[in-house]
Curated annotation (Swiss-Prot):
Keywords: Disulfide bond, NAD, Oxidoreductase, Stress response. Involved in oxidative stress tolerance by detoxifying reactive aldehydes derived from lipid peroxidation. Medium- to long-chain saturated aldehydes are preferred substrates, while the short-chain aldehyde propanal is a weak substrate. Is strictely NAD(+) specific. Changing V178R: Changed coenzyme preference from NAD(+) to NADP(+), but no effect on the catalytic efficiency. This is Aldehyde dehydrogenase family 3 member H1. Disruption phenotype: Increased sensitivity to salt stress. Homodimer and homomultimer. It comes from Arabidopsis thaliana (Mouse-ear cress). The active site is at E218, C253. GO terms for molecular function: 3-chloroallyl aldehyde dehydrogenase activity; aldehyde dehydrogenase (NAD+) activity. Changing C45S: Decreased solubility, loss of dimerization and strongly decreased activity. The keyword Ribonucleoprotein does not apply. The keyword Transmembrane helix does not apply.
Length: 484
């Protein structure tokens, strides 16, 4: 067996130097280069979907539907949009000028940042790797992708496919774990895009600060679901289930983390959830082929610890079965766990779902407000005033009313966090903007130069300049006519 190549600080430095040379030579800036790379990404999606599905099955036990729809199809949509809109995105945006600069014209130019680093996550290893790369390439950057070592089959396939199809002078993949990531983070980048936990997000931000490198941090948090009694119970329950257990078995950054409802309504909600869960996954959901497994034994043990805590284990009202050998945990519903328990203190990122009961739904706003701002917040209700208040007053990366997680499929909406759930946003044109510098450009004429801005200064010049800067045409005429 060949020895694994060492990738340390020297190798990372050489890599960045090579890519920066390509960027400085203008390799990535042209429209044709960008389009060519995007089309090759589409070929990867079209020609290698079975391999992608197989890799996701190896890494996470994902069912084919989840892999094809939530990873490959979403990537196709992102690529199609970029190919369709790229000329418009690249075109300078006209900007208004003022009396102060007359005669002049102005525009905002989207300029590529340079050499960027994308560090992706294991839970959606293709979507969360390639989607930011689409934005980086569309914006004209050279890019290094560091996929997650926790999804080894996906990481290996990503490396193989991107090396096979994309321009190696400007797009590279670095596999590895902490050593390789640390070596990459020592380098000076023009932007770092990270998807993962807030714990590692802090490490990324600290490393970026040394070089004043801007970052996009796509993190997570405890995304709440508020369920009003004035709702369609069956539809509500089905959407919560598919948004929780039907999205990588709860291992998703926008997964429902806990439910808030009233004490009176909770029994109906729980009974309905039990009924639909059995319809979806059978009497023994651990054996269901339609549910992903836990990514590895470390995460399995972490989730088991949340579930086995003394004040929590007796709160299970559904599920709780575990199979460590096959890394399976059944969908588990818990009722009224303590607010200071581990399960309510950290992001769950798995198939456990606490339900907290309240005297009235008004209290849900206080519970959400008392915690760090989540990546997503969800509400199920027919009540128009409640919808409006929730959208207006709950601070989260995104709000969805009467569904779960579907907002991330809309390229017209920015996807990103706020506060501890992240910073920056992407998807659609927001991805292009995330990897662009919006450069202000002003064109002035050398004709019609006025002495009013030059010394020696006078009261008349002061009045005239104030009128110009204020863009007050009436005052300007008064000054010119000697009336002011």
């Amino acid at each position: 067996m060949a020895a694994k190549k060492v990738f340390g600080s020297a190798e990372a430095s050489n890599l960045v130097t090579e890519l920066r040379r390509s960027f400085d030579d203008g390799v990535t800036r042209g429209y044709e280069w960008r389009v060519t790379q995007l089309k090759k990404l589409m070929i990867i999606c079209d020609n290698h979907e079975p391999e992608i599905v197989a890799a996701l099955r190896d890494d996470l036990g994902k069912p084919e539907l989840e892999s094809s729809v939530y990873e490959v199809s979403l990537l196709r949509n992102s690529i199609k949009l970029a190919l369709k809109q790229l000329k418009n995105w690249m075109a300078p945006e006209k900007a208004k000028t003022s009396l102060t600069t007359f005669p002049a014209s102005a525009e905002i130019v989207s300029e590529p940042l340079g050499v960027v680093l994308v560090i992706s996550a294991w839970n959606y290893p293709f979507l969360l790797s390639i989607d930011p790369v689409i934005g980086a390439i569309s914006a004209g950057n050279a890019v290094v992708l560091k996929p997650s070592e926790l999804a080894p089959a996906s990481s290996a396939l990503l490396t193989k496919l991107l090396e096979q199809y994309l321009d190696p002078s400007a797009v590279r993949v670095v596999e590895g774990a902490v050593t390789e990531t640390s070596a990459l983070l020592e380098q000076k980048w023009d932007k770092i895009f990270y998807t993962g936990s807030s714990k590692i997000g802090r490490v990324i931000m600290a490393a970026a600060a040394k070089h004043l490198t801007p970052v996009v941090l796509e993190l997570g948090g405890k995304s709440p679901v508020v369920v009003d009694s004035d709702t369609d119970l069956k539809v509500t329950v089905r959407r919560i289930i598919v948004g929780k257990w039907g999205c990588n078995n709860g291992q998703a950054c926008v997964s429902p983390d806990y439910i808030l409802t009233t004490k009176e309504y909770a029994p109906k909600l729980i009974d309905a959830m039990k009924l639909e869960l059995e319809k979806f996954y059978g009497k023994n959901p651990i054996e269901s082929k339609d549910m992903s497994r836990i990514v590895n034994s470390n995460h399995f043990d972490r989730l088991s610890k949340l579930l086995d805590e003394k004040e929590v284990s007796d709160k299970i009202v559904y599920g709780g079965e575990k199979d460590r050998e096959n890394l399976k945990i059944a969908p588990t519903i818990l009722l009224d766990v303590p607010l200071d328990s581990l399960i309510m203190s950290e992001e769950i990122f798995g198939p456990l779902l606490p339900i907290l009961t309240l005297n009235n739904l008004e209290e849900s706003f206080d519970v959400i407000r008392s915690r760090p701002k989540p990546l997503a917040a969800y509400l199920f209700t027919h009540n128009k005033k409640l919808k409006e208040r929730f959208a207006a007053t709950v601070s989260a990366g995104g709000i969805v009313v009467n569904d779960i997680a579907v907002h991330l499929a809309l390229h017209t909406l920015p996807f990103g966090g706020v506060g501890e759930s992240g910073m920056g946003a992407y998807h659609g044109k927001f991805s292009f903007d995330a990897f662009s510098h919006k450069k202000a450009v002003l064109y002035r004429s050398l004709f019609g130069d006025s002495a009013v801005r030059y010394p020696p200064y006078s009261r008349g010049k002061l009045r005239l300049l104030k009128a110009l800067v204020d863009s007050n045409i009436f005052d300007l005429f008064k000054v010119l006519l000697g009336l002011a």
